[in-house]
Amino acid sequence: MSDFNPSTQLIGELALINCRDLGGMPLSGGRTFRKGIFIRSGSPEWLNHNEFLAVKKYGVTTVVDLRATAELEEFGNPFKDDPDTDFFSIPLFVGNPNDLNDKTMDYLRTHHLGDYYVIIMEELGDQVCQVLRVLLNSQGITLFHCAHGKDRTGVIAACLYLLAKASREDIINNYKVSFDYLGHFLDPLMARTSDDMKHTLRSDAINMEIFLNYIDSKWNGDIRLFMKSNGMTDVEIGSLYSKCIGES
C-alpha cells in the first residue's frame, strides 16, 4: 500500500455527501489517476437550488444515477430533467433497498455487502459496463452516485481503479473510508437500524476484499476480462484506460 491519503480526494466545496474526485490515486508505474474527470458521491436529492447550481458550476455535465428505479421514483434527482446535464439512470439494484422485505435486503441479513457486490458483477454485468461506457464517452466532469456513495458507487470506482492498475491495498483503503465520511449523515439511520443490518450502513474492509477476491478467482485478477465478457471491446477498454491515466 502507498502512503496515499484518500481524504485528499474529498471535494469539500460541494454539498454532496461522501463527494470525492477519483483522481490522485497512485497507480502502477508511478502514474496517478487523472483528476477532474470522474467524481463520486451520495444522492444529490438533498441539494437545495444553490447547492445544485454549485455542482453544475464545478463542471459536472454528466450524471449517472446507480440507484434502483424505485429509489429514483421516490426521491427524485435534480439532474434528471436538467437541460444542461446528460442524465443516465442505470440501476445496480433490482428491487428496493428501502424495503427491508426486499429479497436482496433479506439476503444481507446473513451475508456481507461484498457478497452483494459479487451479485452485481454476476447478474448486472451489462449494466456495470453501460456505466463504464458512459464514463468513457462523457465530456467534462461525470458524477456517478447511488444513495450513500459507498456500495454501488464503490463497485464502479473499484472497477475503474482496477483498470487503471491501482494496488489492492489502496482500493480497499479508498473504499473503507466512506463510512468515516458518512458517519454524521448516517448516525440517525444507524440508531434505528436493527443490529443484523447495521453492517449495511458501514464500509467494512472485508466487503472490498470479497469483491477483489472474486475478481481474482473469476477473472484472474484482470477486470478487462470481465469487461470483455460483458460486451466491451478492446478499443473501448483501452480508451477508458487512457482516459483514466490522462492519455486520452
Label each residue range with its predicted role:
Residues 1-143, 156-248:
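Cys-dependent protein tyrosine phosphatase-like superfamily
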Residues 148, 152-153:
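Ser/Thr-glycine-rich phosphate-binding loops at phosphate-binding pockets of nucleotides
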